[in-house]
A protein has these predicted regions:
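Bacterial N-terminal signal peptides that target proteins for export
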Residues: 1-9
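Short secondary-structure boundary/capping segments
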Residues: 2-3, 61-64, 157-158
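C-terminal motif of bacterial Sec signal peptides marking the signal peptidase cleavage site
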Residues: 16-19
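C-terminal/domain-edge helix-coil "capping" segments
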Residues: 21-42, 178-284, 291, 297-368
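Conserved hydrophobic helix-helix packing surfaces used for dimerization/oligomerization
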Residues: 44-47
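N-terminal segment of the mature soluble domain
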Residues: 51-142, 182-187, 320-322, 326-360, ...
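Long, contiguous interaction/recruitment modules in multidomain scaffold/adaptor proteins
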Residues: 86-95, 101-247
Length: 368
């Protein structure tokens, strides 16, 4: 929920600021540290399906009672076992795509296909030894369970004079990581995330009819579920959005041209010139924030934090509000403070994770 809250703020920034000053949006790709860290010598991994065969699931939905005068026409929820074979394949494919391990081997056939009743069970050390030896790997990542909660909702959208048919699936995979030399799993992951589909129609029946078919929904939900644990296991590339001030003076406008030409050093010189050459706190704040983005692009996160802090303090002076003391301040009151504060928080988080990321990437001699 916090993620969507921040994104909503960013959208509001553009509306609040664009009328009185120029902002330009750029994209940035950066590597995010994983929750887990593995020794560099662990280079070959097997992704296995440690479950029994997935039963032929049919959605047995429980329909909710809808309140009177509600825009919701109908809502039903079902709980099902997800297809772990599909999830295992998706997990292996996504881990291989990150190019972190030298080799990724997949064993998507259910290891406990002979179980008479579906159950969750950890691998014994003997089983781990045998799997690692047979597959020629250093560690085992096992998909051991997958639960799905599917909610189907049909509602009337008054502002668009139409009906929406939506399917929201929350996926709960269970993944365990095994090392041959350990008698118990190294760790157990219980991540979760949601995937969403929607269709529209002139009537409730039309919207419901156009909703994603159950078979396709279960397939795509299982594929999605397989990708959920990846960021906990290996470093992943993340795409972010940054904002640059591009107006207010000739150097700032010229610097924006350099950014479009990917000449960041030239842009930095002009931003620094703008920062040092003005007494206007607003212009200093704009230049400081741009310089923070420059240092982030150069992977100098400590310096990026330093300049973002300067921008935040200047924004606080400009807007004569201190959000930490005035909990009723809104984005309309302090748009620059919110913009600089959100960016500073993200930079600090990135910088705090840098030692862990460097340790995780030491297998590549810090070449990342």
């Amino acid at each position: 929920m916090a993620k969507f809250y921040s994104l909503a703020f960013v959208s509001l920034f553009l509306l609040a600021l664009s009328s009185c000053q120029s902002l330009e949006q750029i994209s940035i790709d950066y590597l995010q540290a994983a929750d887990l860290s593995f020794p560099p010598q662990l280079r070959k991994v097997a992704i296995v399906n440690n479950t029994s065969n997935t039963p032929d699931n049919k959605l047995m939905a429980q329909t909710e009672k809808i309140k009177e005068n509600s825009p919701i026409v109908s809502r039903a929820t079902a709980y099902v076992n997800g297809d772990t074979k599909v999830a295992t394949e998706a997990l292996a494919e996504e881990i291989a795509h990150q190019n972190y391990f030298d080799e990724v081997v997949i064993c998507d056939s259910a290891l406990r296909a002979n179980d008479k009743l579906p159950r969750e069970s950890t691998l014994s050390q003997e089983e781990v030894h045998k799997l690692a030896s047979d597959l020629g790997v250093d560690l085992i990542i096992a998909v051991e369970n997958l639960q799905l909660k599917a909610t189907k909702t049909v509602r009337y959208l008054d502002e668009f004079n139409c009906f929406q048919g939506a399917v929201d699936v929350k996926a709960y995979p269970t993944v365990r990581i095994y090392l041959p030399e350990r008698s118990r799993p190294m760790t157990t992951l219980h991540p979760n995330d949601s995937i969403f589909w929607e269709e529209f129609g002139a009537s409730a029946i039309e919207a419901a009819t156009h909703m994603i078919p159950d078979r396709k929904m279960l397939q795509e939900a299982a594929e999605f579920a397989g990708t959920i644990p990846v960021k906990y296991i290996v470093p992943v590339w993340k795409k972010g959005t940054r904002y640059l001030y591009t107006g207010g003076s000739v150097p700032m406008r010229d610097a924006a041209v350099y950014v479009r030409e990917n000449s960041w050093d030239n842009a930095y010189e002009l931003w620094h010139q703008a920062f040092e050459g003005t007494k206007s706190e607003k212009k200093k704040m704009q230049a400081a924030l741009n310089i923070a983005v420059y240092y982030e692009m150069k992977d100098s996160l400590a310096q990026a934090v330093e300049w973002a802090e300067k921008a935040q303090q200047l924004a606080k002076k400009i807007e004569k509000k201190n959000v930490s003391e005035n909990m009723h301040a809104t984005i309309d009151d302090v748009p620059n403070y919110y913009l600089t504060s959100l960016y500073l928080a993200e930079l600090k988080e990135r910088n705090s994770q840098l030692p862990k990321l460097k340790m995780q990437m030491s297998r590549f001699n810090d070449d990342f």
